Amino acid sequence: MDNKEKEDEELSDELKDQPGPSEKPRTPTVVAFTKPSFYRVNTVISDVKVCRSMSYDMCGNHQQELLFDLYKDETTGKVYLPRFFKALLESGIRKDDPRIDKMIQNIKDADLLDDFVWGTQHIYLEKDTFKRYIGSSIGVVTKALKKQMIIPDWERFVSDMGEIFEDVRSHNEGDLATYIPQLSRVAPDSWAMSVCTIDGQRKMWGDALKPFCLQSVSKPFTYALVHDDIGPEELHAHVGQEPSGRLFNDISLDHNKKPHNPLINAGAIVVASLLKNKLPLADRFDFMIHACRKFVGSGYIGFDNSVFLSERETADRNYALSYYMREHKVFPKDLNLQDTLDLYFQICSIETNCDSLAVMAATLANGGVNPMNGERIVNNRACRDTLSLMYSCGMYDWSGQFAFHVGLPAKSGVSGDMIIVIPNVMGIALYSPRLDKLGNTVRGVKFAEQLVQKYNFHNYDSLIYSDNKKIDPRRQLKDDHDGQNRFMYATKLGDIAAIKRFLLMGHDIHCKDYDDRTVLHVAAAEGDVVTLEYVLSKWQEDPNPCDRYDRTPLDDAKHFNHTACVKLLEEAITVYNLKGQDD
């Protein structure tokens, strides 16, 4: 077995296990270039010149052709699928992403793959087949490979998040919830986390597929659904919006004789009483289960009947709350109190896992639209009001401290689950059943605190004139000159993956800097044979251009005694000159 076959086999095995970010990228394969048949125009938007391709208007397949040219194998002239999918994985697009389901199914239907697209077979696709198979997913594929997702440097981000996750694992303080017998029997040291961005980038750590009950984390979603259904005026005629300053199950009402907010037990019971309350109890529960399944998309939603029965048998406090509120006429008229409480207990007993819960949180971060399938679940106003309540009331009696130190909407539950929503960026789900004295997951709170120490996610970290040194991992809008500089720098580093990305984004490989130097000058001066060979394979003009000092790439290669680069450039110049004579 030669070295290339061995590398391909190792790559297939690595992808099959769906790893985290690799420590060092492999040397990319040098490929031949076929110039795509499209042209570009310049568009001015708000005084910023932006390049955009007109080929989409003329010919809908130019992106497929460009992707093929950028990722095809040097030897076979075909795309090696595991390597192509690895590039997607490194951008945050997982193999179970529903947006690439059709693409993967097309390949499976052709009997080219086994059950896992990241299988052990060496799969190569020719151009027409490749274009046909990826056409249904070209939007998300192109966006991912262009690094235009909300978190462009996904590998670095998941590496940092993994470090925080492992650091927080050492916190073993806290106790299990005991007032619900079933919750007191779970494994106390379980620790899980999952992230889902508004662009559908996903990653999970630890016991992220282990099921647990939503408990109080269901409350924001129930509130959002009722808000979307009946509107904020009718909803808040029965429940307030203020932090209570009391325990989550305290028997008390605000000065208007309403529960303080929808995220404590009293408020959540009232919200449950408003959920499709014209329907029979069974239909109301069906509505809630189906709504949760819409929130998770293709993720897991179940129901733990034992927790439901256990909670109903030990719910004296919630019964007392409900009778107290009925005395003060908080509920809508003609209410069946037992049905309302049963529905509330059922909603708390809905089961999911960290990986699916992250998608639910990301749906809130995305304005009520599921990022995995684009389906709107709740309207934007309902989502906005939900996040406002989570920010001020989501962490029981620690809500004020959490808003001050972390500055993000969040909600915790006594099962040990917790969600953090970073609006317009991502949702984070955490699970660790050890709770502090206020009922919040200890590790979840510690994670949130460390998260905002590293990243500028706090609601007020982005104030102007800020002097903090926190990282902003979000995609930044760059002008053309900045992109050109980064293109040159990628060439200096020999980062062929980045060079491919810049070409896919429409950057001109022949562009020059302020000294009229090109990427050929940079690669030749660095003596990077692999990068120089790749750049030459894309070069369509004279491969020996002069800079402002009349120095050519060949001059630089000779000056620094890079003999292999000299040979490459001389061969390219000869081929170019011969082609000119033929023309």
Curated annotation (Swiss-Prot):
<dbReference type="Pfam" id="PF17959">
    <property type="entry name" value="EF-hand_14"/>
</dbReference>
<dbReference type="InterPro" id="IPR012338">
    <property type="entry name" value="Beta-lactam/transpept-like"/>
</dbReference>
<dbReference type="GO" id="GO:0006537">
    <property type="term" value="P:glutamate biosynthetic process"/>
</dbReference>
<feature type="region of interest" description="Disordered">
    <location>
        <begin position="1"/>
        <end position="29"/>
    </location>
</feature>
<comment type="similarity">
    <text>Belongs to the glutaminase family.</text>
</comment>
<feature type="repeat" description="ANK 3">
    <location>
        <begin position="549"/>
        <end position="581"/>
    </location>
</feature>
<dbReference type="InterPro" id="IPR002110">
    <property type="entry name" value="Ankyrin_rpt"/>
</dbReference>
<keyword id="KW-0040">ANK repeat</keyword>
<feature type="binding site">
    <location>
        <position position="414"/>
    </location>
    <ligand>
        <name>substrate</name>
    </ligand>
</feature>
<feature type="binding site">
    <location>
        <position position="311"/>
    </location>
    <ligand>
        <name>substrate</name>
    </ligand>
</feature>
<feature type="binding site">
    <location>
        <position position="216"/>
    </location>
    <ligand>
        <name>substrate</name>
    </ligand>
</feature>
<feature type="binding site">
    <location>
        <position position="344"/>
    </location>
    <ligand>
        <name>substrate</name>
    </ligand>
</feature>
<dbReference type="GO" id="GO:0004359">
    <property type="term" value="F:glutaminase activity"/>
</dbReference>
<keyword id="KW-0677">Repeat</keyword>
<feature type="repeat" description="ANK 1">
    <location>
        <begin position="482"/>
        <end position="514"/>
    </location>
</feature>
<dbReference type="InterPro" id="IPR015868">
    <property type="entry name" value="Glutaminase"/>
</dbReference>
<dbReference type="Pfam" id="PF04960">
    <property type="entry name" value="Glutaminase"/>
</dbReference>
<feature type="binding site">
    <location>
        <position position="265"/>
    </location>
    <ligand>
        <name>substrate</name>
    </ligand>
</feature>
<feature type="binding site">
    <location>
        <position position="396"/>
    </location>
    <ligand>
        <name>substrate</name>
    </ligand>
</feature>
<keyword id="KW-0378">Hydrolase</keyword>
<dbReference type="Pfam" id="PF12796">
    <property type="entry name" value="Ank_2"/>
</dbReference>
<feature type="repeat" description="ANK 2">
    <location>
        <begin position="515"/>
        <end position="548"/>
    </location>
</feature>
<feature type="binding site">
    <location>
        <position position="318"/>
    </location>
    <ligand>
        <name>substrate</name>
    </ligand>
</feature>
<dbReference type="InterPro" id="IPR036770">
    <property type="entry name" value="Ankyrin_rpt-contain_sf"/>
</dbReference>
<dbReference type="InterPro" id="IPR041541">
    <property type="entry name" value="Glutaminase_EF-hand"/>
</dbReference>
<protein>
    <recommendedName>
        <fullName>Putative glutaminase 3</fullName>
        <ecNumber>3.5.1.2</ecNumber>
    </recommendedName>
</protein>
<dbReference type="GO" id="GO:0006543">
    <property type="term" value="P:glutamine catabolic process"/>
</dbReference>
